[in-house]
Amino acid sequence: MNIGNNNLVLSKYPAAIEKHPDARRALCFGDSWFQYVPHPTDLNKQIARLFKRTLFLREGVAGRDSAMWKAALPRIQREIGTFGFDAILLSNGGNDIVGEELREFVKTAAQPQSTGAGPWGEIPPEVFDHIRLETFEHALRYAIKDMKEVVQMRDLLSRDTIIYVHTYDYIFPSGKAFKLGPFTMGPWVKPFLDNVGLTDPKGQRVVTSWLVDQFARALRAFVSQNANMRLVDSRGTLKTASQWENEIHPVASGFEAIAKKCWKPALTGVLE
């Protein structure tokens, strides 16, 4: 089966299914890790290259936040009900955990702390001093809730479809922004931590790694509570700052490494 271009927008997807009715089908719904403009390097594109006999419906949007996620849900529900996907790949939560939303739950060491009800275990001093734990707990809950809505749609319309979620990776708070010509986004992390008095690079990495670990913990619990869900744990894949183009996006070889080392084993047997 020679599909050719297998990473498609909605307007081209029905014709591709008609031409290749036996091909596997996957929906990629998420953020800039699934649609990193203008680079041909993001996870969606890397995974499509690995599974050339699968038709991928491209629903990634750079900078997608919770409001944008919710706005897309009616269309996503129609797609799930119409196309009978073998797999749904979700990329969500990064902006809520170590992106723009970080400014909502950082604090100075002098400001009061409320730990909330999260199962934090041992909390690093840098985290206790500079993260509003109760507020972060709410951010985690909202990120999971957004994904849960897709799971509920799947349960209603296509119960055998397998849903995949992922952990991102440990970032380096470098202060590097995303740049495209005159357009700049970010940086997302270092300025927020600097502003609350956490300026030590090692301390900043302690905090951001802990945040990613807590997101992974919440995802693991979420996956364990739902049938036909799998967690792709990509933490620790990218070990150096040079593997990151900016604070929250890997370079091309970084996306490729995550796709090959983490996503390919998880998807093999479901996609082709």
Residue ranges and their predicted role:
Residues M1-D22:
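Short N-terminal or domain-adjacent regulatory/targeting segments
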Residues A23-L27, W33-L133:
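Conserved SGNH/GDSL esterase-like catalytic core that processes O-acyl groups on lipids
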Residues Q35-P38, D96-E100, I171-G181, K239-S242:
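Short catalytic/ligand-binding loop motif for oxyanion handling, primarily in non-cytosolic enzymes
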Residues G60-G63, M229-Q243:
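Acidic carboxylate-rich catalytic motifs and surrounding loops in phosphoryl-/glycosyl-chemistry enzymes
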Residues G118-K145, V150, P201-T208:
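Surface-exposed cleft-lining segments at the edges of enzyme active sites
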Residues A139-V189:
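Hydrophobic, aromatic-enriched interface-forming segments
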Residues S174-R230:
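Substrate-gating cap/lid alpha-helix
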Residues S242-E272:
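Histidine-centered active-site loop/cap adjacent to the catalytic His
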